A protein has these predicted regions:
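Noncatalytic, solvent-exposed loop/strand surfaces
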Residues: 1-228
Length: 228
């Protein structure tokens, strides 16, 4: 039951993101009183260590089933990275000091943005699929500068967080599932190395790779019937 084998319990504001654990911290994002929040908890006790508010220069259309704090944080050994569609990316150290921010958007996604950032090899990788002008961006985790950015013109609606894949031969890739296409991008340059057609319009779930096989699922219309 709820009172048995519970080490600690802490009340937090509402958010749809997942908590992320690293070292002695638990990081999460939340939305409360029109504020975009990043919160750090002590991993041993659940005590709140700090919370920081991101700027909110605009209010974007959002499906009532979504939340402005839907994307989950990402971490490396020194920093936590958060993405709010109504501002962009921000980086904090583990003590809550803001290191940089990278404004992005505005966005036009029917349900609101949902993909979380991914950190690999010093880069913060973020898929921003929307009705028009979709893109994939890599930002230097140390200074917030754009390492590369590539357009995704075929992507119209997706909320799936990408994954990193290391093939037996070749460089690490970012596997991105989006409207109608599954694609592999070189993390070093952003070049799209391969793609497979046949996906449906709404791709929502994180892909899984096992023994060299990618498993993906989605929801919506067939390839030639987008939006219906």
């Amino acid at each position: 039951g709820p009172e048995h084998n519970v080490i600690w319990k802490t009340s937090v504001p509402e958010g749809y993101s997942s908590p992320v654990l690293t070292q002695d911290r638990v990081f999460l994002t939340a939305f409360e009183d029109d504020r975009l929040l990043t919160i750090a908890l002590d991993r041993s006790t659940g005590r709140e260590l700090w919370r920081r508010e991101a700027p909110r220069p605009r209010v974007e259309r959002l499906d009532p089933r979504n939340n402005p704090a839907a994307p989950s944080p990402a971490v490396d050994d020194e920093r936590v990275y958060v993405f709010f569609a109504e501002f962009g990316l921000l980086a904090y150290d583990f003590d809550g000091n803001k290191l940089w921010d990278a404004p992005l958007g505005p966005f036009d996604n029917l349900y609101g943005m949902g993909a979380s950032p991914v950190v690999f090899d010093g880069k913060v990788l973020l898929v921003c699929d929307q009705r028009t002008d979709s893109f994939l961006i890599a930002i230097n985790g140390t200074n917030g500068q754009v390492a590369w950015r590539v357009d995704r013109p075929e992507a119209a609606s997706s909320h799936a967080t990408p994954i990193v894949w290391q093939p037996n031969n070749g460089e690490p890739q970012l596997i991105v599932v989006g409207s109608f296409l599954l694609s592999g991008y070189a993390i070093s340059t952003g070049q799209r190395l391969w793609w497979v057609r046949g996906m449906i319009h709404e791709m929502k779930s994180v892909p899984v790779i096992s023994n060299g096989i990618a498993y993906v699922n989605g929801y919506g219309s067939p390839l030639n019937d987008p939006g219906n």
